[in-house]
Amino acid sequence: MRGLLIAFEGIDGSGKSSQAVLLKDWIEMRRDVYLTEWNSSEWIHDIIKEAKKKNMLTSITFSLIHATDFSDRYERYILPMLKSGFVVICDRYVYTAYARDVVRNVDFDWVKRLYSFAIKPNFTFYIRVTPEIALERIRKAKRKIKPQEAGIDILGEIPLEEGFLKYQSRIVEIYDKIAKEESNFITIDGNRPLKDVQIDIRKILGEYIDNSL
């Protein structure tokens, strides 16, 4: 049985995490599946969280510490699961690092080299929404905007909602550029209801997953 690597990308509030979970639940009825999230390495997660809280990361340190998290999960979980024939779903992949690091003025080619060890996903679903829609969803969920979601480390101390719109707009610009360059990127209109987005994703994957059993 062949392993399959699926990644979800998008700005905060895009609904990509919800789509990843919905897809996992659907695939579980067909074959083994594993879901991994960005910044979820057991031994470095708390370090990253504390460093962000204290706003003590330079642009390069920001890049390297997230690469450490990814490489740990990649070697201990992602690759072994793929070799065992699992469908591996990544809630954020290396493209998150590309976008967030470049926004912080880290050289794009340098970041790509940093993650050059990582294989390309079979499918990367870019759940594209406007920052305004993402912000409205966060409001409806009554969730507080995290300082890092508002880019306070690069924009300074401005109102969180204002920072969110500015920062996420920059992220969208980079994602759009990546989507044009990466052949495995599938741009999905995420401004629609979650159910409609998930239907489109399943239509794309259904036959491929069944044929890879």
Curated annotation (Swiss-Prot):
Its EC number is 2.7.4.9. ATP binds at G10, I11, D12, G13, S14, G15, K16, S17. HAMAP family: Thymidylate_kinase (MF_00165). Pfam families: Thymidylate_kin. GO terms for biological process: dTDP biosynthetic process; dTTP biosynthetic process; dUDP biosynthetic process. Gene3D superfamilies: P-loop containing nucleotide triphosphate hydrolases. PANTHER family: THYMIDYLATE KINASE. GO terms for molecular function: ATP binding; dTMP kinase activity. The keyword Hydrolase does not apply. The lineage of its organism: Archaea, Thermoproteota, Thermoprotei, Sulfolobales, Sulfolobaceae. This is Probable thymidylate kinase 2. SUPFAM superfamilies: P-loop containing nucleoside triphosphate hydrolases.
